[in-house]
């Protein structure tokens, strides 16, 4: 699987290069190239770095991230480990809405299973790499979906965004370099590393690669989750699918 291949066969910059070539962009709304974000965090010199999964899904009617955490929490655990290896971090934090009890429970089970199998903790798969994950709970404030507000909330401060720079990759959680990706972004990492950057880049448009998950709700015929290639028009999503 992806984590074992990275730890045993690839250097951190090799992994980052694959993510860059895949063209994966942040799925939280900003659309920033994920590989570049990881590269920025990798370049920072610090004794401690953090990997943060933004699971604070606050958009009305949105349940994409919740469905991923309920259905495949292991993909998030694996992706966070891969990110930790890539940027030289040993600590992961998942910031999740307290209103998602099933997602929290399944994520907690996945983390404990990973520890039992030696996929989290000290010397993962017999290597020098150590990484562990803990869960932090959000109180439901919509603004905490923004990464600087999220970091403030995790620090016990008021969840207010701050101007960048500095970016979290330079000075984030507790003033240390911090890489923040949302759930859907991270869920793409294992499949990219398994099937290859070229495979992922073959889906979507020239500037936006891969697929996007949408939650359809409201006055339509078909409510629920859909996954479509990037570049699919809103007309197709609403009138042909919804």
Segments from the language model and where they lie:
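Iron-sulfur (Fe-S) cluster-binding modules
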Residues: 1-21, 89-94, 210
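Conserved phosphate/anionic-ligand binding catalytic regions in large, soluble enzymes, centered on
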Residues: 20-41, 83, 140-152, 156
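Conserved alpha/beta core surface patches that mediate binding of polyanionic ligands
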Residues: 22-46, 66-72, 194-199, 204
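Short coil-to-beta-strand
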Residues: 45-54
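Histidine-anchored nucleotide/phosphate-binding helix
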Residues: 72-86
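Short amphipathic, charge-patterned alpha-helical segments
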Residues: 79-81, 231-242
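Hydrophobic alpha-helical positions that pack around
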Residues: 104-230, 241-242
């Amino acid at each position: 699987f992806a984590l074992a291949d990275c730890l045993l066969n690839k250097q951190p910059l090799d992994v980052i290069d694959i993510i860059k070539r895949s063209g994966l962009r942040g799925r939280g709304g900003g659309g920033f190239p994920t590989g570049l974000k990881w590269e920025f965090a990798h370049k920072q010199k610090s004794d401690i770095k953090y990997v943060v999964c933004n699971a604070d899904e606050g958009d009305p009617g949105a349940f994409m991230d919740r469905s991923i955490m309920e259905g495949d929490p292991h993909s998030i655990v694996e992706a966070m480990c891969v990110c930790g290896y890539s940027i030289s971090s040993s600590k992961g934090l998942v910031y999740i809405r307290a209103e998602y009890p099933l997602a929290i429970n399944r994520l907690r089970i996945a983390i404990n299973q990973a520890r039992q199998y030696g996929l989290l903790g000290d010397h993962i798969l017999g290597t020098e790499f150590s990484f562990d994950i803990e869960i932090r709970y959000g109180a439901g404030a919509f603004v905490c979906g923004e990464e600087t507000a999220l970091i403030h909330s995790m620090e016990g401060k008021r969840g207010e965004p701050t101007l960048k720079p500095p970016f979290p990759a330079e000075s984030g959680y507790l003033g240390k370099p911090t890489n923040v990706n949302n759930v859907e972004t991270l869920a793409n990492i294992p499949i990219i590393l398994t099937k290859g950057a070229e495979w992922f880049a073959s889906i979507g448009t020239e500037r936006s690669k891969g697929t996007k998950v949408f939650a359809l709700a409201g006055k339509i015929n078909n409510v629920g989750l859909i996954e479509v290639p990037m570049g699919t028009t809103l007309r197709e999503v609403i009138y042909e699918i919804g």
